[in-house]
C-alpha cells in the first residue's frame, strides 16, 4: 500500500515508526485577529485548569503562545469527579469557512444483517490525535488568568483539533475514514459503520470478524489513532449511537424525560428534536404528538416561556412507554424491502418492512408549507420521501409499495395528481393495496378522509345553483332559490366570501352547485375536505378553515363549486346571477340592513327608501329575529268607515305599556285616511291627560273634523266636549263594550306595541332610554319609513300631501249589496287592506265594504250591465285553452277533498282568491259570483317541469268548501303558472237548452268535464 509506505519508515534499529498524519489546513474569512477577553475563574476551577493545561502540555496537545488571538476557556466537573476543559470558540468559528458535514445523518443499525456477530470500538481522544495545521495553531490560543493579577497570565495555543471548533467533526471523520479505507477494501464482505469516533464491524462468521478486527487495529494504530480498551464491545446487548442492538432486534436505550426543566421554547425545541431523532424506531404517529408540536407555536424567541399542558404531558408519557417497548429488526441482506402507507389521522404514516419484520417508521412533518395539503398529496409526498430513505439505507427502491387506494383510484391519481406522479416517478416495482396480516400495526388510528366523498369536480345535474359574494365591510351573502345576507366580524372580502360558502353548505341540505367570484375561496373549498390545514397565527382564519372543513365533512349530499370572474360585461344568466349576489352586499343593501336594525322598518319602507328589490327587502325583515317572531298572523281586517282625506276622521284610544312605569298610559291617535299615528305617554287617562295629548296631536297632525273614541270617562266628560266644541271638532263614540267600532285604533295600538318590542330587543337603539324617546323612534318608523300594503307612499307623505295612491282607484267593480243580496256595478274610491270604499253611482253616498264582497271587471260599464242583466254563463270545456293562474308569491293549494262541511257562500274560493292574481284579475275557484265553478270532481293541474311535482289531479266537489287540509298543502314557488283544465273527454260546445243559468251546470253527456265562469 503506497500510503502505508509513505507513513512508515524503518529506523536504524529496524523498528517501524509512525509518522503523524498530515494536517488539513483551515480556510479563514479574515486574517484580522479575534480577541475575546478571558473572564475570571473561581480558585478551585483555576487550579483544575492549571493541572489540565500541564497535562495537555506534557502530551504535546498545546504549546505556549504569544498569539494576538484569544478565546475564553473554562472547566466543568463530570459526575466521576474529573475535570474537563472547554474553549468558547464561538467568535473564532464565525470567521472560519465551514467545510460542510460528511455524514449529514446517523447510520441506521437496522441495516446490519441479522444474526451477524459484531464488535464495536471507540477511538480514544480522537480529536487530540489529529494535528492542526501549523499556521492555524495561533488562532486557537487561550489564557489562564492570575488571581488579583499578581503575576502575568499564562497563555497557550492548541496544536490538535480543539473540541467546539466548527470543522473538528469533519476533519476527524476524514482522518478516521482514511484509516478505515484499507479495511473496507480488504474485507468488502464485512459490514463496517463509522460515525465520528465510533466504529462497528459485522461479519457473517465470527472468524471473519476476528480477522477484520485484527487488521483494523493495525490500520488504526498506523494512522496514529488509539482504541479505548475499556470501550470495546464483543457481546450482546451492544450499545451503539443510542441504540441497544441484539442479534435480531434493535431497541432504543432506556431513558427518562425530565419534565421539570421544560420552561422555554428552547427547552421544548431540544426535547422534540431528540424525540424526532428516535421516532423512526419508536413508531409514534404525527397525530399522537400534536399537542407537543403545538407548544412550539407563538413567539419565536428561544427564551419565551412555554407551559407543559396536561395533553402534552400524556404525549410525553406515551414517548416514554414507547422507549420501553418499541423495537425494530435487523434485515436479511438477500430479501427486498417493502413500503406500507397507512392512512392515519392528521397525516399518513409509512412503514418499511421486510416480510413482516418492521425495519423503520416514516412520518411527515407536523406543519406544512402550503395552507391546504390534500391527503392524496401527503401520501405521494410520504412515498417520495420514504423511497429516498430506502435508497439511502440500502441503495435500492422498495420492491413493493402498499397504499390505501383501490386500483382505479391509483389510476386516477396517476392521471390527475401531479404530486402522485412525482412521488412515484421511475418506480418499477409493484403498487398494491393488500396489507400483510400482522398485529403490530393495529394500534394506528386510521382516517377515512383520503379522497373526496362530498366534493365533486364536475357540476351536479338536477341540483340547485347558488351564487355567493362577500364584501370588505363585514357582509356575506348568497342568492339562489332564496337570498340571505350575513353580518360578519371580518373586514376582508375573502373571509366574508368564505362565510357565505360555509352558510350555503349549512343551509342547503341537498345537492348544490356553488358559484363564487373568489378563486381563493373556490380552491380552498375544493381542497378542504381531505386537506391538512396549516396552522396560522391568525386565529380567525384558523377558525374559518376548521369550520369549513367540519361543515363539508358533515354534509350528506354532494356539492360542486366553481369560479366566475366578477364585474364583466359578458352576457348570460350566470353573470346576471353573480351581479345579483354582488348587489346583496352592496352599500344600498347594507344601509337598508342598518336602518332595519335601528328602526325595524317594514319591507315596503325599505324598498321605498333604498335601491333594493322586493325580495331583498323581504329577506331583511324575515331574517330579523325580532320581526320574525313578532309578525304574527292577523285576522282579515273588518270595515270601519274611514276619512276620504287627511284629518277627516281620527280614532283615539289609550293603551298601556307597563315597561314605561309611571308613564305607562300611552294615548294613541290615528288618522283613518293616511294612517298617520301620534302618541304620547301620560301618567293617567283623565280628561286633562286627553286634552294634553290632543294638543300635541294638533301640533303634529293638524286639527281633525271628527274624532271617534270609545265610551271611556275621559272622552264622555263635559270638559272634553267643551274642549272639542272650542276646536270645532265633532265627536262620536262606538257601541259600548264593543271594540270593533274602534278597530283601526285598536290595531294601531298593537302595531305600536309590537314596534316598541322590536326596537327594545333589536339591540341597535340603546340610546333611547326614556319612554318618550322610545315612543318617538317607533312613531318615526311607522309614519316616515313603513309603507303599508296596497300603498306606494308612507303615512307621513299621504297625510302631508293629501295624495293617497290606491292601486285600484277609479276601477269598475262588482260589489255585493247584502241587503238585497244582489251584485251591483260601482267604482273604487279607495282600496285598503281588506276593505274598500265604493261609489254606487252619482249622488249616492259611498259604501264601505270588505274586499271579499268585491269583484273586478275589465269590461265597459255598458257591457257589464248587459252581462249582469242577462245572467249569462259561459262554459269552459276540454277543448278550450287552459286557464293560467299566475302566482304572486307562493300559493297553498287546498287538499284533494275537504269533506268537513259546505261552507258559507262568501268563503268559497277564499284561499285561492287571496293568493293569486298577478297579471290577470283575481281568479277564484268556488261557488261565488265571478269564480270559476267546477261542476265535477276531477280537474287536472299542470305544473311546470321546474317544479318537483309535474302533474297531479285536483279534486273538487260542487258546493264544498275549499278550505285547505294541512296534510295536503302543496307549495308552489315564485312566479310560476298553474294551468287548470277539465279532465276527461271533450264536451259539446253548446249549452243544453234546458239548463238554468242560476243553477250548477251539469251535462248528462259529459259529467266531469265542464265548469262555468260568470
Swiss-Prot record:
Signal peptide: none annotated. It comes from the Eukaryota. A zinc finger (Integrase-type) spans 587-628. A motif (LPQG) lies at residues 161-164. GO terms for molecular function: DNA binding; RNA stem-loop binding; RNA-directed DNA polymerase activity; RNA-DNA hybrid ribonuclease activity; zinc ion binding. It catalyses: DNA(n) + a 2'-deoxyribonucleoside 5'-triphosphate = DNA(n+1) + diphosphate; Endonucleolytic cleavage to 5'-phosphomonoester. CDD domains: RNase_HI_RT_Bel (cd09273), RT_Rtv (cd01645). One of its GO terms (biological process) is DNA recombination. Residues 811-859 bind DNA. Keywords: DNA integration, DNA recombination, DNA-binding, Endonuclease, ERV, Hydrolase, Metal-binding, Multifunctional enzyme, Nuclease, Nucleotidyltransferase, RNA-directed DNA polymerase, Transferase, Transposable element, Zinc, Zinc-finger. Residues 57-245 form the Reverse transcriptase domain. Mg(2+) 2 binds at residues 469, 582. Zn(2+) binds at residues 596, 600, 624, 627. A motif (YXDD) lies at residues 195-198. Early post-infection, the reverse transcriptase converts the viral RNA genome into double-stranded viral DNA. The RNase H domain of the reverse transcriptase performs two functions. It degrades the RNA template and specifically removes the RNA primer from the RNA/DNA hybrid. Following nuclear import, the integrase catalyzes the insertion of the linear, double-stranded viral DNA into the host cell chromosome. Endogenous Pol proteins may have kept, lost or modified their original function during evolution. The LPQG and YXDD motifs are catalytically important and conserved among many retroviruses. This protein is synthesized as Gag-Pro and Gag-Pro-Pol polyprotein precursors. These polyproteins are thought, by similarity with type-B retroviruses, to be generated by -1 frameshifts occurring at the Gag-Pro and Pro-Pol genes boundaries. Has a type 1 genome. The HERV-K(HML-2) family contains type 1 and type 2 genomes depending on the absence or presence of 292 nucleotides at the 5'-end of the env gene. Type 1 genomes lack a pol stop codon, leading to expression of a fusion protein containing a portion of the Env sequence. Belongs to the beta type-B retroviral polymerase family. HERV class-II K(HML-2) pol subfamily. This is Endogenous retrovirus group K member 10 Pol protein. It comes from Homo sapiens (Human).
